[in-house]
Amino acid sequence: MPLRPLLVLSAVFSACLSSLIGANAKPNIVYILADDLGFPELGCNGSDRYKTPNIDALANSGVRFTRFYTAPLCGPSRALILTGRYAFRSGAVTQDACKTIIRTGEKAEVMIPNVLKKVGYATAMIGKWGQLSPSGDPSQWGFDHDLHFKGSGMYWNSKVAKPMSEGGEVRGDPDTYVLDGKTIKVKDDEYIPDLLHKDATAWLEAHKAGPFFLYYSMSHVHGEILPTPDSAPAQKGESEDAKRKRHYTDNIVYMDKLVGKLVAELDRLKLRENTLIVFMGDNGSAKANAPDATIGGKRIEGEKGSMKEGGGLVPFFATWPGVTPAGKVNANVADASDLLPTFAEVAGAPLPTGRVIDGRSLVSQFK
């Protein structure tokens, strides 16, 4: 196509985007990241086994992607998301390598909250920070507020979790979480996903004047899979495998419930109309759960940690009332590096300079 028509189209699109955003030139952004949730584990993606009515309704209100990819492991995926740069640039090529991401000096990486804060956004990270911790806590990467935990799949404290877990094993540090730099003990009656949700909704209430960026890094559905507060008691004669599968389903159902409650809170606060919500999984299904993650009786080859399709293909959708058409399915290829430039365009923020940003804004794909 000749250059002149391209320039005209670009100008028209920019004008359309400005009018869609409206008088409130800085929309809010809520980014929901599910842990170890593979593409076939949502009802809207055709899951045979799992029912996710709240997430499905949210997906159907916007644009759902069917070929969205990320790194197949938690740490590298989250580094890719937050920096918009591939691992060979950031150094986050493995879980352990994530601790070496450079935070200060000329070669420092720049993350999404740093970009958005420059144009007036309040920023919060609530949930799993994981392998990025050695490189600095969320507050050191531009988040005004953070609540993160170190339980790695143990969502009750060790006293409560030990009798529930296989072999009585307790992983990570489920007994504490960190709230704005202060380490706090998890009480016996506290369920980490509920604690995260409570903090997220309180933060939304406090920052409803906007604009804000909430990175809601959910704990579900990372293993070890333990009962949720809604799980039924053990069934007589139930095998360990059957119990594990039932509890995994319970965890997906509970995650779906929390997403529904978060959206309801945005509605209650009258924030939904001016908020872009993006939902995504951080990598494919965990190996133990991948065989049950089928669509039409077939599984996607590969799982978390694998370079096959199922390792990096993840659920992804975006919804923004008045901007994203309801029920649209997008089959274009996109990946997690696209989030930083997408959020920057939505916020009207310049991209970081002096570095290569591998991602490209998806805003035009949301139409």
Predicted features, each with a name:
Residues L7-S19:
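Bacterial N-terminal signal peptides
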Residues I21-K367:
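Formylglycine-dependent sulfatase
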Residues M1-L3:
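N-terminal secretory signal peptides that target proteins for export/translocation
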